[in-house]
From Swiss-Prot:
Domain Ig-like C2-type: 27-110
Gene3D superfamilies, A to Z: Immunoglobulins (2.60.40.10)
Stretches of the chain found on the membrane's Cytoplasmic side: 394-432
Sequence intervals crossing the membrane: 373-393
BP terms from Gene Ontology: cell population proliferation; cytokine-mediated signaling pathway; decidualization; developmental process; head development; maternal process involved in female pregnancy; natural killer cell differentiation; placenta development
Organism: Mus musculus
Name of this chain's protein: Interleukin-11 receptor subunit alpha-1
Length: 432
């Protein structure tokens, strides 16, 4: 029975040796020296690091004197484990025939990489970044190779590998793991991102096609401030600035949306202001309000940004105090201050004093459209009037210069038939 078991063991070892030898020789160095890697449930080949290839050695587990594989196995300096599992992890020692230790090998088990999950985002119109995460936890040291290239139009095979289309390396961020950044991208172009995960047991690649206008997502607006408007217990004035990562250009602007709610109210009210400020006119008097803003490309490219941190403000509770200046004292100083303020080139700061005129929240574009429509209708009316006047003058001039044509403004009743008009018909009496 023991001989049959030993024979079966020899057969399994021979099969495992054939499988491992056909797949790969001794594994190349990866990570710390003296460490080799394997996958659970698969055969593993360990190589004695201190001897030349083909030298017969004996193998032991570290701290265990039992022989695992003798020098007469015919495997030389290699140790073949038919099917490894977690108990097989650890350190193995190899010795030559003279008893000298050849070296130590540490076996670690893990899994080959799966396809990584990749996503890309652009915070402005000329740079974008891509992040990734492993498809599965391999338990082994892992590296990532990242590159990108510009996609060509269908049929442009000659440009597929030209220097103008790449591929180029996607520089990985040294401060943030699993992230690479592409600078100087073209807003209307399409790019292919290549992220390859590599570990000692293999490699796996993910290819992702991206368009800058589709992945555009600005950073949240900055500097949000909420202030009360004196004398108006239901108004709040909110202002903010562009995110620092967005370069302001006339053809690449942002639009904004603003949300606000009173304290202890879960529902948000949303408005889309024009510009970098908004006056809330329906605030709840006496209650603090939370306000937040987000941004998006003004042509709706990409998606809305994340919300900015909330800012709080409470409407004014006191009545408006009209201060009457004392002109009997310091009249000259006040007049000089007013003149100096009018002559100053610095832009006037917005006043927080209430404006008695009603607020006009109409869109300036809407006002321009109305004015343009009125102008077009006025021009059309003038053109029609001028055409009618010219036609009337022409008909009048032609009637004076020659006889009227029958059928064209000619009288329907003969002149001699009209009452009170003498008969002008030629007779002998008329000539006598």
């Amino acid at each position: 029975m023991s001989s049959s078991c030993s024979g079966l063991t020899r057969v399994l070892v021979a099969v495992a040796t054939a499988l491992v030898s056909s797949s790969s020789p001794c594994p190349q160095a990866w990570g710390p020296p003296g460490v080799q890697y394997g996958q659970p449930g698969r055969p593993v080949m360990l190589c004695c690091p201190g001897v030349s290839a083909g030298t017969p050695v004996s193998w032991f587990r570290d701290g265990d004197s039992r022989l695992l594989q003798g020098p007469d196995s015919g495997l030389g300096h290699r140790l073949v484990l038919a099917q490894v599992d977690s108990p097989d992890e650890g350190t193995y020692v190899c010795q030559t025939l003279d008893g000298v230790s050849g070296g130590m090998v540490t076996l670690k088990l893990g899994f080959p990489p799966a396809r990584p999950e990749v996503s890309c985002q652009a915070v402005d119109y000329e740079n974008f970044s891509c992040t990734w995460s492993p498809g599965q936890v391999s338990g082994l040291p892992t590296r990532y190779l990242t590159s990108y290239r510009k996609k060509t139009l269908p049929g442009a095979e000659s440009q597929r590998e030209s220097p103008s289309t790449g591929p180029w390396p996607c520089p990985q961020d040294p401060l943030e793991a699993s992230r690479c950044v592409v600078h100087g991208a073209e807003f209307w172009s399409e790019y292919r991102i290549n992220v390859t995960e590599v570990n000692p047991l293999g490699a796996s690649t993910c290819l992702l096609d991206v368009r800058l206008q589709s992945i555009l997502r600005p950073d949240p607006p900055q500097g949000l401030r909420v202030e009360s408007v004196p004398g108006y217990p239901r108004r709040l004035h909110a202002s903010w600035t562009y995110p620092a990562s967005w370069r302001r250009q006339p053809h690449f602007l942002l639009k904004f949306r603003l949300q606000y709610r009173p304290a202890q109210h879960p529902a948000w009210s949303t408005v889309e202001p024009i510009g970098l400020e908004e006056v809330i006119t329906d605030a709840v008097a006496g209650l603090p309000h939370a306000v937040r803003v987000s941004a998006r490309d003004f042509l709706d490219a990409g998606t809305w940004s994340a919300w900015s941190p909330e800012a709080w403000g409470t409407p004014s509770t006191g009545p408006l105090q009209d201060e009457i200046p004392d002109w009997s004292q310091g009249h000259g100083q006040q007049l000089e201050a007013v003149v100096a303020q009018e002559d100053s080139p610095a832009p006037a700061r917005p006043s927080l004093q209430p404006d008695p005129r009603p607020l006009d929240h109409r869109d300036p574009l809407e006002q321009v459209a109305v004015l343009a429509s009125l102008g077009i209708f006025s021009c059309l009316g003038l053109a029609v009037g001028a055409l009618a006047l010219g036609l009337w003058l022409r008909l009048r001039r032609s009637g004076k210069d020659g006889p009227q044509k029958p059928g064209l403004l000619a009288p329907m009743i003969p002149v001699e038939k009209l009452p009170g008009i003498p008969n002008l018909q030629r007779t002998p009496e008329n000539f006598s």
